[in-house]
Amino acid sequence: MTVPPISERASFEVAKRLLCQILNEGLVSGTLETFESEEPYLCLFRNSCNTEKPEKCIRVRLQPSAQAGIFMRSARIVSLVRPEMLQMPVTLVDGTSERRELRSGALFQFASSLFTEHVEASTLEEIALGLENSEANTEKWLELHSSPGPLDLNSPSVLWERALIWGHPTHPFHRLCYAQEGLAPVEPRDLPEFLTPTLAFVSVLRDEISISGPFEESLQPLLAQLDVPAPETADRVVVPCLRLQLPCVFRHFPSAVLVKTVSGCADTQASMRTLTLRPELNFPYHIKLSIACQITSDVRAIRPCQTLGGQLVRKQLHEFFPPDLWWFKEVASVAGNQTAQGDTQENEDKARHIGCILREDLEARANANNEALIIAGSLAQQPANDPRTHAEIVFGLETVEQKHDWLKEYVAGFLRAVLPSLVQYGIGMEAHGQNALVRVCRDTRKITGFVVRDFEGIKVHVPTLEKLGINLCMTSPGCTKNLEDIWSKIHHSIFQNHLGNLVYALGLDRHDGWTIIRDELFAALKPDTDPRAKELYDFILQDTMPFKCFLRMRMSEHFNDYDGDEQDQPRVKRDERPLPNALLMGSARWEKVLNECAPKKLES
C-alpha cells in the first residue's frame, strides 16, 4: 500500500477527527453509501434533509472492516463512529459539483454549511483556524518522528511519553498549540523547543508567591547540580519556569529576576508542560510548569486551585487507594499569590503564570522491580512508520485470541486499580490514557500494575466520605454532592477514552472487545453482592453514554470552564450528548438500545 505524503497524512488526521465529531455531536446526520464495487462510504448531510440522496454532503471512505461496527436505524447512523474507521479520500458534494478536500479549514467551512443550528461566523472562523493550527503542528510532529527508533520494555518512560505523536485520539484540536496574550506566537518550527525545553530559573519575592510543601528543600539539589545561584536575601525564592513562559512571568510578577537559563537538561512528557529531568542529574521529581498556551482544549497554565488536588491526595485521599495502585505524589508546589488580594478571576489569571509542581518520579522504583513504566495512551497509538499499535508490537499480539487474552489481563488489572476507591469512598480518578501508566515486567511481559497521576481532575463525593466519618471542606478541589457527575466523568475518561481507545485500536470492537470489558467490570465490582457497586455498574451499563461534545463546547464558549461543584441541582449538559452505550455492543440489549435511538421524525 502506498503511504501518502506527510502533509496529506497530517491533514487527514484532523479531517477524520472532525468528521466523526460533527456526526457524533449531532451537528449533522450520517448514513452509509456503496458505489458499485467500492468499499462503503460514510455520507454526512444536514439534519433537516429528508431525501435518500442529499444534494449537498460530505463523503469519506470507510476502512474495509469498519462497516460492521457502524449501526443504522431509519437509514441514519445512530452509533458512535470513530476516526479509526475512516480512510481517504474525502469528497465534498454540492449538486453536480464534486471535489476532494483534506485541508481542515476548507473542510470545516463546507461542513459548517450543513449545520442547522446557528453559530456565530466569528466562532466558526476561530474553529477553522484552530483546525488549521492542529494540522500544521501534526505535520511537524510527523516530520520529527518519521523514522522513530523502536520502543521496547527497556525504553525509558519519557520515550514512551513521546510515542503519543498523534495526540488526543478523537479531538479535532488534537495538536493545537496557541500562544496566549503575552507570549510570542507559537509556530510548528518551535516544536523542538517544546520537546526539549530550556529551563529558566527566576528569583521572586516570597510575598508574591504561595508555597505548599517542602518546595525549596526539594528543589535545592537540582539548583546545586545546575549551578543556579541561591537567592541573595531570605525574602526571595528561586522558581523554575519554561523559557518560553518568561514574558508572562515578568508581566505578572514585577519582582521576578532571571537568574539562569539551562538547556539540554530535561524532556517534556505527553502533556507538553511536565518535564522529566535527564538521568545524570539524579533528580527524584518531575517538574510540572505553567505554559500560557492553549494545548488541545485548555490553556496549560497552572491555576492555584489546581495545585490543591495533589495536596488533598497527599494528605488524605491516598489512604483510600488500593494498596497495589501506585500514584505520583505531588510533594510541593508554587503558585502566584495574587488570589490573596481577592479571589477574583483576574487575580487567578495572573497567579497561574508561575505555577510549578514537584511530582515524584517513580522510574527508579519501577527499575528496582525490573518493570517498565509505559504511558497507557501510547499502547493504543501507532508509530509513524508502522500500521501496528505499540501494544501489538511490544506484547506480540498477532491474532484475535492473543489480543483477547492481553485485553482481559489489562482490563482486569486496571479496573481493580481504579474502581474500589470510587465504589467505597466516592473518589473518582481521571485515569484517561494520558493520566495513567502501565507497569510491565521486563522478563515476562506481564502487566504488574498501574500508576495514576495529575490529580487536578480528581472528583470526590463528600457525602460518601462523611458517612465514613471523614470530613472535607466543600470548597476543596473536586468536591461535590453530585455522585452521578463523578460517574459520568469516569465513564468518559476510563471507558470511552482509556479502554475504548484500546478496543478500537486493536480492532476488537468487532471481536468481543466490549464483552471482555463488561465481564471484567462485573468481576471487579461484584454488583450482585454490593448495593453501591450495583448502582455504579448499572450506571456504566445504562442504555446511553454521555459523549463529550468538544465542538459544541467551543461554540457555546463552554470550553473547559466548568471546574466548580454541582451541589444540589444538575447542570445543563451542554457539553454532552447521549449516544448508544458502546459498552453494550454485542450484548442482548444492544439491538433494543439501537431501536430506541432511531430518529423519531426528520425535520422538514
UniProtKB/Swiss-Prot annotation:
One of its GO terms (biological process) is siderophore biosynthetic process. It is an enzyme of class 6 (ligase). Pfam families: FhuF (PF06276), IucA_IucC (PF04183). Pathway: Secondary metabolite biosynthesis. Signal peptide: none annotated. It comes from the Eukaryota. Its EC number is 6.-.-.-. One of its GO terms (molecular function) is acid-amino acid ligase activity. InterPro entries: Aerobactin_biosyn_IucA/IucC_N (IPR007310), IucA/IucC-like_C (IPR022770), LucA/IucC-like (IPR037455). Keywords: Ligase. It catalyses: cyclo(L-arginyl-(Z)-dehydro-4-O-homoseryl-tyrosyl) + citrate + ATP = NK13650 B + AMP + diphosphate + H(+). NRPS-independent siderophore synthetase-like protein; part of the ank cluster that mediates the biosynthesis of NK13650 C, a highly modified cyclo-arginine-tyrosine dipeptide. AnkE is responsible of the production of NK13650 B via ligation of citrate to the ankD product. Within the pathway, the cyclodipeptide synthase ankA acts as the scaffold-generating enzyme and is responsible for formation of the cyclo-Arg-Tyr diketopiperazine (cRY) from L-Arg and L-Tyr. The ankA product cRY is desaturated by the cytochrome P450 monooxygenase ankB to yield a dehydro-cyclodipeptide intermediate. This is NRPS-independent siderophore synthetase-like protein ankE. It comes from Aspergillus thermomutatus.
